[in-house]
């Protein structure tokens, strides 16, 4: 059975990313799946500093050649999956530094694997989604699902709760459902599955 990592890209505290990722995971698991196992993975759990290995990631052909324990653990975790779903915030018009740093830590673990991208933010994180998609497809040589999911918080108190308390509000959950985002997530995940089956 192939394994898919659902990667939470935010590392700040508090962060709503864990709630968003849990919501996405619930959506994916709402459709019975017998060929793919989806597991949550949080970048924050790896405590990655700004890249500090002595060689470029592309020059590390094997995980054992990393010199730092955090690099080895991150490489080993990513290598163990056959595909990915990134759940990322938008910071200042792009992906978060933590997301970019985590992606850039590795190279040989990524190419050829399928990935879907779900972004979120006050306006849905469209630019973060686009920038990560370009990085993964053009540089890391991954196969990016065509369907991109952008989730905007409901206006008012939900925005405050998301940004300042790390809480995903009920109005936002309802708005995402009514806007058809659950269906888009399932479509994007289906595209990941199709790529794996090719």
From Swiss-Prot:
What keywords is this UniProt entry annotated with? Flavoprotein, FMN, NAD, NADP, Oxidoreductase
Reactions the enzyme catalyzes: FMNH2 + NADP(+) = FMN + NADPH + 2 H(+); FMNH2 + NAD(+) = FMN + NADH + 2 H(+)
Q: Which principal EC class is assigned to this enzyme?
A: oxidoreductase
Q: Where does FMN bind?
A: 12, 90-93, 120
Q: Which Pfam families match?
A: FMN_red
**Biological role stated in the UniProt entry:** NAD(P)H-dependent FMN reductase; part of the gene cluster that mediates the biosynthesis of the meroterpenoids arthripenoids. The pathway begins with the HR-PKS atnH that catalyzes two chain-extension steps to form a reduced triketide, which then primes the SAT domain in the NR-PKS atnG to initiate three more cycles of extension to give a linear hexaketide corresponding to the polyketide part of arthripenoids.
Query: Could you give the subunit structure recorded for this chain?
Result: Homodimer.
What protein am I looking at? Answer: NAD(P)H-dependent FMN reductase atnL
What is the organism field in this record? Arthrinium sp
Q: Which gene encodes it?
A: atnL
């Amino acid at each position: 059975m192939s394994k898919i990592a659902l990667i939470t890209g935010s590392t700040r505290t508090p962060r709503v990313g864990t709630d968003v990722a849990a919501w996405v995971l619930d959506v994916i698991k709402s459709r019975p799946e017998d060929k793919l196992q989806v597991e949550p993975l949080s970048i924050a759990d790896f405590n990655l500093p700004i890249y500090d290995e002595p060689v470029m990631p592309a020059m590390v052909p094997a995980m054992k050649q990393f010199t730092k324990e955090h690099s080895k653990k991150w490489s080993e975790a990513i290598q163990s999956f056959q595909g990915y779903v990134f759940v990322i915030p938008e910071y200042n018009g792009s992906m978060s530094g933590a997301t970019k740093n985590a992606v850039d830590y590795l190279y040989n673990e990524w190419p050829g694997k399928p990935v879907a991208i779900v972004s979120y933010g006050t306006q849905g994180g469209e630019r973060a989604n686009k920038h990560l998609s370009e990085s993964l497809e053009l540089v890391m040589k991954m196969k990016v699902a065509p369907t991109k999911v952008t989730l905007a918080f409901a206006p008012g108190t939900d925005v405050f709760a998301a940004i300042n308390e790390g809480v995903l509000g009920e109005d936002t959950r309802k708005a995402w459902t009514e806007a058809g985002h659950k269906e888009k997530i399932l479509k994007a995940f289906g595209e990941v599955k199709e790529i794996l089956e090719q």
